[in-house]
């Protein structure tokens, strides 16, 4: 679409066979998680903007590069908070958003001690992976060592979170949103479907629209997203939204990734 709109498009990542590259004017084999390499590439090519799409780990890189080059962006520190699950959970808790009880750790011995503060079942997640990789639902402490090792194997920062499982009321909420100059201007929320038997790598099976839930839930979600956008001083940005209405009646924002797709 960017090409159709007349933009000169340059793509980069470490997988040359990814399908999007064939539509770009130029492709460079540079990992989107290597901030300095992407910065040097963008500076050399004198780009006018950097956009992260479909993958949370690329979002901080885009913000970092734009900030260093003086290009339009939301603050790098804010994007980093949105992109790392432990930082995001801490931010939510400190700013009075609903958040499941959680602990952060970086090793099995630490997790074994910390999990005593939680009620099973719990979710174990890498703080910085994408595509639901390394996510497991733990129902028995005997599973802990394997699940910790799995989560750590997908974390570049070698950090994980363990959080109490939220019993959903209805479907999980998923979709995209856009802010313009810090104001939420658009969203499309859908019902997200998961296999009832899934216990690992919680990738959705699909989504459907229109969203089937009470209008007041949408209103509450809009208010929470706008508050996050305002407090984090986000600018003109796309977001990937994941939320859950718990059976306890509380609405939880699980993800507000600073990227679309």
What residue ranges belong to the model's regions?
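ATP-dependent carboxylate/phosphate-activation module, predominantly the ATP-grasp catalytic core
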Residues: 167-172, 176-234, 238, 245, ...
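ATP-binding N-terminal substructure of ATP-dependent carboxylate-amine bond-forming enzymes
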Residues: 1-78, 109
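Conserved ATP-binding module of the ATP-grasp superfamily
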Residues: 98-100, 121-124, 136-169, 200-207, ...
